[in-house]
Amino acid sequence: MWNDMKLAIAFLSRVPVPLKQNKGNLKKICAYFTFVGYLAGVFYFSMKLISENFLWTLLSVALGFYLFDLFHFDGLLDTLDGFFYQGTKERRFEIMSKGDIGPFAFFYAALYIVAYLYAFLHVDPIDLIYVAVLGRFSMNILLHFGKPAKNTGLGKLLHPYEKKHTLISLVFTIPLVYFPLNYIISLSIALLLGSSMHFITNRKIEGYTGDVLGATCMFSQLSIMVALSLI
């Protein structure tokens, strides 16, 4: 179990983790999405406790993205470009695999960052743990109900997805019940967006990819943060 947890940290973040060769099962890292979320959440929580100055917030978000969210954000950009293209599924795959930033990705990514920074400035520090943990749980929901859209890539590597991983990942969120309203709001959004992305991706590309998983995480994190900033 510990090797799988370390593999999850190494796979989903830039936090240096010592890994023994051939230790850990890639398909089992899904059970620890929310565990990795605690690492990201505690980082953002700690940075916001130090200062809520705007320049410090920019630095906090930049470092947090570098350590924990850049991988997911890249998936968001590719997904935006691919899904807004009005064409065939094959052409969408081609656009998403290029890695270039197209007009849709540039425009909506700019809006995303502005909204993210605004919400970050207006949430309580503790809320950032809910954002990071439950935001990642939305990926479990997408994996639970979906199937990979391609026979290659990260989506395929995580398939077949063991349904019990959703429960394990949910169990890691139990400490967050300490603030029940925050938990209910965050969990509800994660469930809603994970399920919604399942239906959207089925219509667009007939399944999920690694990019779509990242986009789901980023959409969920922003939505949870905005919701918690309003209470």
From Swiss-Prot:
> Cellular location of this protein?
Cell inner membrane
Q: Which GO terms describe its biological process?
A: cobalamin biosynthetic process
What Enzyme Commission number does this protein have?
A: 2.7.8.26
Which topology term describes how it sits in the membrane? Answer: Multi-pass membrane protein
Q: Which superkingdom, per the lineage?
A: Bacteria
What InterPro entries does its record include?
A: CobS (IPR003805)
Q: Which cofactor does it need?
A: Mg(2+)
Q: What keywords were assigned to this record?
A: Cell inner membrane, Cell membrane, Cobalamin biosynthesis, Magnesium, Membrane, Transferase, Transmembrane, Transmembrane helix
Pfam name, any one: CobS
Q: Which reaction does it catalyse?
A: alpha-ribazole + adenosylcob(III)inamide-GDP = adenosylcob(III)alamin + GMP + H(+); alpha-ribazole 5'-phosphate + adenosylcob(III)inamide-GDP = adenosylcob(III)alamin 5'-phosphate + GMP + H(+)
Q: Which terms does the record give in the GO molecular function aspect?
A: adenosylcobinamide-GDP ribazoletransferase activity; cobalamin 5'-phosphate synthase activity
Give me the segments passing through the membrane: 29-49, 53-73, 101-121, 126-146, 167-187, 211-231
Instruction: Kindly tell me the pathway this chain contributes to.
Output: Cofactor biosynthesis; adenosylcobalamin biosynthesis; adenosylcobalamin from cob(II)yrinate a,c-diamide: step 7/7
The terms describing its cellular component in GO are: plasma membrane
| Task performed by this protein | Joins adenosylcobinamide-GDP and alpha-ribazole to generate adenosylcobalamin (Ado-cobalamin). Also synthesizes adenosylcobalamin 5'-phosphate from adenosylcobinamide-GDP and alpha-ribazole 5'-phosphate.
HAMAP family given for it? CobS (MF_00719)
PANTHER family recorded? ADENOSYLCOBINAMIDE-GDP RIBAZOLETRANSFERASE (PTHR34148:SF1)
Q: Which family is annotated?
A: Belongs to the CobS family.
Its protein name is Adenosylcobinamide-GDP ribazoletransferase
Organism listed in the record: Kosmotoga olearia (strain ATCC BAA-1733 / DSM 21960 / TBF 19.5.1)
